[in-house]
Amino acid sequence: MLQISFNGARLKEARLFNKKSITQIAEFLNVSKQMVSKYEKGRATPSEESLEILEKKLKFPRDFFFGNDNFSLSSTGTFFRSRYTATQTEKMPAEINKNYVALIRDYLGEFIDFPNLDWGLSGLDYTPQEYASYIREKWELGDRPIDNLSLLMEEKGFVISRIDTQSDKVDAFGSAVKVNNNEYYVVMLEGIEYSFYRQQFSLAHELGHWLMHEKECLEECLAHSTCSINVSYANDGILTLVTQLGISFPALRETYTVYI
C-alpha cells in the first residue's frame, strides 16, 4: 500500500497564505517553534490532533498537507503597485494567489484555446510615449478610448484575476509565471470594492511594467521575491497610457491625487 508522507512545504505555503508566523503556528499547536520548523522542512510529522488544528486555523483541507506537486513552477520578480509600508507578510498571500491562478490557467489551457501573449512586444527601446503609440498600432486600437482594458488585455493573452486578501496596502501586481514549459503573464487586482476607473489605472500601470520592465525584471530581480516600482516612471510613463484609456480626469485626480 502506497503511504503518502506529510508535505512540509505545503504547511509553509498555507501558513504564509494566512499571514501567520512560525510562532503563531507553534502557539496554535502548543509545540515549540523548532518543531514547527521541523514540520515545514519535512523532518517531522504533526500528530492527528495537530493536523485537525491546522485544518481549522489555516482553512486548508487535510489532503493538501499530504499532496505532492506534479508540476514545476517558477516566477520572475513581481512588480507590486503598493504603498511603501506594505510588508512581505502582507504581499505573500497575493503572491501565492498569483501562482494558483497560473496553475488554473495552465490546466484550463488543455481544454480551452486561449489567446497567446506576444512576448516580443515587451522590452523594446521606446520611450513611454512611443510605446503607447506603438501598442495602439500593433493592437489596431486607433485613437479611440479603451473602454475596458481588462477585456482587451485578456484578449491579447494576459491572465487577469481579482482577489481580496483584506490588504489595504496592495492595489495590483504582476509577473511572468512559468508552469512546466508554459509561460504566462499574470496580473492580479487586489480588493473587490475599488471603482472601475481605479482598476483601469492599475491595469494600465501593470501593462506599462510588462512593456518596459519585464525583461529587466527577469535579469535583475531573480534574487528577490518582489521588485519595487519606479515612482518617477509611474508618474511619467504610465500616465501617458492612462490618458488614452478614456478615464475621466476628475476620477483620476480624486483617487490618485494626479493633476494633468
Predicted segment positions?
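Short juxta-domain linker segments that transition from a proline/glycine-rich
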Residues: 1-260
